[in-house]
């Protein structure tokens, strides 16, 4: 690709951005797997606790567990697909964003736009940087925050249910 006036090697920059984008996608997949695990475990514990409440086995303990597991499942579902207000906060979309692509009337016009980026290395670096920034700030970070909330509800629910169970045994 060559270098610009400042000596920036565009090939190295594109490899760096490609590696950064791959790492970000891998982190997002890891969060998705963790969200799926929390959703599954919380759902199982929720179903178990509801059946125990129905059978009148330690209703207070299982009510506490149920409430926390409902909150864990809901926040995990939001982590799987964060709400729009967390994902889109008026950021400038890159040309690689699917809705930006759909705005072009034809594939030929989109191709022309991509070719203009390929002919202008600074514009290509800018688009790559914008895409990485948007994915990180408006996709990965909201998913991570919601996953942590879900995990905290899950752990808190188990801890509170355990404390409630021990308390009911002692008193």
Model-derived features: positions:
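Solvent-exposed, non-transmembrane helices and loops of integral membrane proteins
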Residues: 2-9, 89-137
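Alpha-helical transmembrane segments and their immediate juxtamembrane boundary regions
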Residues: 15, 19-22, 26-90, 145-171
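Hydrophobic alpha-helical transmembrane segments and immediately flanking/interface helices
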Residues: 127-154
